[in-house]
């Protein structure tokens, strides 16, 4: 590991963010810090993750949602201070890393099937 990677790893550890495992196709709820005047509150932005870029401290992800019939996309830096929390609402089955094709689709063709993991979780044993 060179010096730049080492410094970046230290910064990511110092950020202390609890980032769940998610990928393109998953529906995520992002808690965004919004400042209104002198008070700060958390505003949730829920939508489908259509892209994810893993570049250390420069990692980001794009979330797309439909708001009053209009598509809204937002790019969130993963380690930005405005991102308060990330929650995975549901997992989706997709065969692409980038889902930009969803921009041109509406209705049923824009739906993503839910991924069901049949593997046992860490705490429970598999039935044999």
From Swiss-Prot:
**Gene3D superfamilies, alphabetized:** 2.30.30.790
Has the keyword Nucleus been applied to this entry?
no
Coiled-coil stretches: none
Alphabetized UniProt keyword annotations: Ribonucleoprotein, Ribosomal protein
Name one molecular function that GO assigns to this entry.
structural constituent of ribosome
What are the GO cellular component annotations? cytosolic large ribosomal subunit
The signal peptide, as residue positions, is none
- A Gene Ontology BP annotation from the UniProt entry: translation
Q: Which domain of life is it from?
A: Bacteria
Question: Do you know which PROSITE patterns this protein is assigned to?
Answer: RIBOSOMAL_L19 (PS01015)
Q: Which residues cross the membrane?
A: none
Please name one Pfam family that this protein belongs to: Ribosomal_L19
The record's comment on protein family reads: Belongs to the bacterial ribosomal protein bL19 family.
Which PANTHER family is this protein grouped with?
A: LARGE RIBOSOMAL SUBUNIT PROTEIN BL19M, RIBOSOMAL PROTEIN L19
HAMAP family, sorted: Ribosomal_bL19 (MF_00402)
Any idea what job this protein has? This protein is located at the 30S-50S ribosomal subunit interface and may play a role in the structure and function of the aminoacyl-tRNA binding site.
Protein name per the record? Large ribosomal subunit protein bL19
To which species is this protein native? Erythrobacter litoralis (strain HTCC2594)
The organism's taxonomy opens as: Bacteria, Pseudomonadati, Pseudomonadota, Alphaproteobacteria, Sphingomonadales
């Amino acid at each position: 590991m060179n010096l730049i990677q080492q410094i970046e790893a230290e910064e990511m550890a110092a950020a202390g963010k609890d980032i769940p495992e998610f990928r393109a196709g998953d529906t995520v709820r992002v808690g965004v810090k919004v400042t209104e005047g002198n008070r700060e509150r958390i505003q949730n932005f829920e939508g489908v993750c259509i892209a994810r870029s893993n570049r250390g401290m420069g990692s980001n992800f794009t979330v797309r949602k439909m708001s009053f019939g209009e598509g809204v996309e937002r790019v969130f830096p993963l380690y930005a201070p405005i991102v308060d929390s990330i929650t995975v609402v549901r997992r989706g089955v997709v065969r692409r890393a980038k889902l930009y094709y969803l921009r041109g689709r509406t209705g049923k063709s824009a739906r993503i099937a839910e991924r069901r993991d049949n593997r046992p979780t860490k705490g429970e044993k598999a039935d044999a």
